[in-house]
Amino acid sequence: MGIRAIVVDTAGTTTDLNFIQDVLFPYSVKALPDFLEQNQHNVLVENCICDTRDIALEPDADLARVTEILQQWVSEDRKATPLKTLQGLIWKQGYAHGEFKGHIFPDFIEAVKRFSAQNLRIYSFSSGSVDAQKLLFSHSDGGDLTEMFNGHFDTRTGNKLDKQAYCNILNTISLSPKQVLFVSDVIEELKAAEAAGMMTCQMVRDSTLRTGEFRKISSFDELLIE
């Protein structure tokens, strides 16, 4: 049967976690007040504002309070869909204005080309929105990598710690579990993918990272698919 598709986590796997924590997150926190003020009547932004009120159980929160809630969620690294959607919109402006480039590990840049040449399907699964993932890979320091991908998944597919999310991915891409390899640095995500029947591999780029009973690699150079 063999592996026919690879699903990659982003932060800590294809992308340096420091880029997300030290560049992207602070940028979104700083930009949120003006962005919401200027775009509050945009339908998508308006829906995110309403969803934030619902999740926070503050139906009467004004725009300033909604901004505070969202900024607090950033500091807590909450995986709330309205926050992730808004961050994607804000980062789109940042990329467009040349404020930063998407950091991608060089070994993944080479590997994704190799996998594509092998006719392997490549997907990403992140708590960041699909739009944010596309921005990351299209504005990467290795150029535009989006044509190498067959698709992207985010919190709308499910929580990355839940088995059902990986079952949903399998249903979407129409492959059997053993034909799909999931690569992540997070043990709990690997356990959830394994529970769904997927093949798994832990990316260990940091020697201090907590590891589990999974196949381990420290670079995509070590990931050879026959």
Curated annotation (Swiss-Prot):
What does the record give as the reaction this protein catalyses? 5-methylsulfanyl-2,3-dioxopentyl phosphate + H2O = 1,2-dihydroxy-5-(methylsulfanyl)pent-1-en-3-one + phosphate
Q: Known CDD domains for this protein?
A: HAD_EP
Q: What GO biological process term is on the record, naming one?
A: L-methionine salvage from methylthioadenosine
The cofactor note from the UniProt entry for this protein is:
Binds 1 Mg(2+) ion per subunit.
- Spans through the membrane: none
Alphabetized, the UniProt keywords read: Amino-acid biosynthesis, Hydrolase, Magnesium, Metal-binding, Methionine biosynthesis
Known pathway:
Amino-acid biosynthesis; L-methionine biosynthesis via salvage pathway; L-methionine from S-methyl-5-thio-alpha-D-ribose 1-phosphate: step 3/6; Amino-acid biosynthesis; L-methionine biosynthesis via salvage pathway; L-methionine from S-methyl-5-thio-alpha-D-ribose 1-phosphate: step 4/6
| One MF annotation (Gene Ontology) recorded for this entry | magnesium ion binding
* InterPro entries hit by this protein: Enolase-ppase_E1, HAD-like_sf, HAD-SF_hydro_IA, HAD_sf
Which family is it part of?
Answer: Belongs to the HAD-like hydrolase superfamily. MasA/MtnC family.
How would you summarize the oligomeric state and partners of this protein? Monomer.
Q: Which HAMAP family match?
A: Salvage_MtnC (MF_01681)
Q: What is this protein called?
A: Enolase-phosphatase E1
Q: Which organism is it from?
A: Shewanella baltica (strain OS155 / ATCC BAA-1091)
Q: Which gene encodes it?
A: mtnC
